[in-house]
């Protein structure tokens, strides 16, 4: 069993956490980067990173791929964590980074459901989970974006959802499906009554970004800041160690989608993210231009959105097979 890094290395990991919090990185990214830094240090017999370079990083990344069997995406995540450690925490110039071999991701087409399949999956889901999955599909949301929605982020009058701090720290506006608006309003009415009750019991405080909570100390207790899909019970915030109410855990919807896909008899590899892929593809099939879809998805580069043009419903790219002419 691997031993933990020495106190000096632990201080380095604490420094890494502090720098990431100063830069407003998400807690998930913080945990990931700290875990990769710890693994890197332990892999090299607890040597200090400032005494290592491209050779040690390449050896570590190769170990992950060959013995760990990780994907190219995971390798690149580890590399990003180590780059941050060297550049931002140790303040080490890294001209030798050109010598680090970056894993090349395989180009895979996204899995997409047909509209009939989307409906079949949604029909198998219980009401609350169906609403969340409906927003993943109807608004093109990532799972974390859906769970992070707060009451104030929905504009029923304009039919819009404001996605705050999406991937890459960007905000964007996407569509609120008209078909889901009444269901979402009903959900919020029920949620508001529940919030009033738990507030009277002193359990109405929601988790907030640290900077916002310092600026608006009353905000965690206000209705407009509450998560639309809150966790059933408050829990200890891993950063402040205070008891707050967070959003619903990701695994709740992931399990519900998995069960619904099985019940619907769909054999495709479907996850929560498949709804977002299907949203983009169906918009393109319905004639919306690529730039509009790019903005709704929040892609910084249109080339990322272009991948969906390869999975449009054209029946083998619209080609007539020679076998059909025999």
Predicted regions and their residues:
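Conserved catalytic core of the tyrosine transesterase superfamily
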Residues: 1-326
